[in-house]
Design a protein with these regions (language model features):
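Anionic group-transfer/hydrolysis microenvironments
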Residues: 28, 50, 170, 205, ...
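Thiolate-centered catalytic microenvironments shared by cysteine-dependent enzyme domains
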Residues: 55, 61-162, 178-179, 194, ...
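Helix-loop module immediately N-terminal to the HCX5R catalytic loop
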Residues: 51-81, 200-237
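Extended hydrophobic/aromatic segments used for targeting, binding, or gating
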Residues: 2, 219, 262-294
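Glycine-rich loop at the start of a catalytic domain that most often binds anionic cofactors/ligands
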Residues: 36-42, 96
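Flexible, polar/low-complexity N-terminal or interdomain linker segments that lie immediately upstream
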Residues: 1-35, 115-194, 282-294
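Short active-site oxyanion
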Residues: 20-24, 106-107, 163-164, 237-238, ...
């Protein structure tokens, strides 16, 4: 199999803006609408991450046939190079994880630094939505590959297991149990505050250069992961989680695609699931372990 770089630079993308084999998508959630209409990478489609990747009613990823139908409706074929970016890097890396790892789309890339680096470089923006010609998309796999996911039952059954490290990628305030939601206006939280027992904290934001949002150099990433005992010679397995799994997918992406470490999975139920399950333990500094009650 040809190994393709998962991260692309703004200069690479600008050189491929007119390449018919390359499609660009800006992943967003509702507050980002004005960002897209005010100006976006030329040719970029505009995707609501949940509408593109999730089941229409269930708290579950859409099956490959449905995602394939959605991709085809946006003019994306199985041999298309798909470049994802966002105003928040986590969303693009989440999209990569779902589309490449679980769906099996062969060539997915993430724009390093996302929209921020693109604008800082003074690169062109467009207010024109691209013309789309739908195509037929045959799923590369017959079923979704869930091998990079961890379930709540798996996490619960292996709490404290030697060789397994849990990484909480939320903000320090969320980890300490001072709040559940990172920003006001979100409609999905949890019944309890705190973190999964034994989880070590590594804020997903710390994976990126604060100046331009690019991924930090490999040596710096390795230092961060070693500080929480997550390097391959320190842990047999790493499970990353956050609130909804966007920040956790950045842990997965940087470990697997930048450092080449493949002993990591994502608990995608994350805190919105764990923090509301009846009967599971919760740690919060200064408080005894909590067991949510009905």
């Amino acid at each position: 199999m040809i190994q393709r770089p998962a991260l692309v630079t703004p200069s690479w993308l600008e050189a491929h803006l007119d390449d018919p084999a390359v499609a660009i998508a800006q992943l967003r959630f509702e507050p980002d609408e004005d960002d897209y209409t005010a100006g976006h990478v030329p040719g970029a489609r505009w995707w609501d991450w949940k509408a593109m990747l999730w089941h229409p009613t269930d708290r579950q990823f859409a099956d490959p046939a449905l995602i394939a139908q959605r991709l085809g409706s946006w003019g994306i074929a199985p041999d298309t190079t798909l470049v994802l970016y966002s105003g928040r890097n986590h969303f693009a890396m989440y999209g990569y994880w779902v589309l490449h790892e679980m769906l099996g789309h062969p060539d997915v890339r993430v724009l390093d630094g996302g929209r921020r680096r693109w604008e800082l470089d003074g690169r062109p923006l467009s207010t024109v939505e691209p013309a789309i010609t739908p195509v037929a998309y045959r799923p590369p796999r017959g079923a979704r590959d869930d091998s990079s996911r961890a379930s709540r039952d798996d996490v619960l059954a292996n709490l404290g297991r030697t060789g397994r490290v849990l990484i909480d990628a939320r903000s320090p305030e969320e980890y300490r149990g001072e709040r559940v939601k990172p920003l006001p206006g979100f409609d999905h939280g949890a019944e309890r505050r705190g973190h999964i027992p034994g989880a070590r904290h590594l804020h997903g934001r710390d994976l990126f250069d604060p100046a331009d949002a690019t991924v930090k150099p490999p040596a710096e990433l390795e230092r961060l992961f070693r500080a929480v005992g997550a390097a391959p010679d320190q842990a047999r397995e790493v499970i990353a989680y956050c609130r909804l799994s966007h920040r956790a997918s950045s842990i997965w992406f940087t470990m697997t695609r930048v450092l080449g470490w493949h002993h990591v999975r994502v608990y995608d139920g994350s805190w919105t699931e764990w923090g509301s399950i009846v009967g599971v333990p919760v740690e919060r500094p200064g408080a005894p372990a909590e067991h949510p009650e009905a």
